[in-house]
Amino acid sequence: MAIFAEFAACKDSGVSANSAVVQALVAKLQAHITTHYYTCTDEILAGLGKMYVADERFKKNIDKYGEGTAEFAAEAITAKFGA
């Protein structure tokens, strides 16, 4: 998913996970999931963020965009919605 390439680019550029740019990516990810798959509530996205690092299948897939991208995306989601 191209959105994760954008997360990776921000991570690699040193942009903070709670910056406006990265938080806009979180909103973009939520809208993408809602448009293409199912209604992605804040609670659902918060859970997905946790799965991005807890489930090795998610982590491996997302980290194809760059090592640490899954962790960065999860951190950004947590910054938006809390733990």
Locate predicted features:
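Amphipathic alpha-helical "stalk" segments
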Residues: 1-83
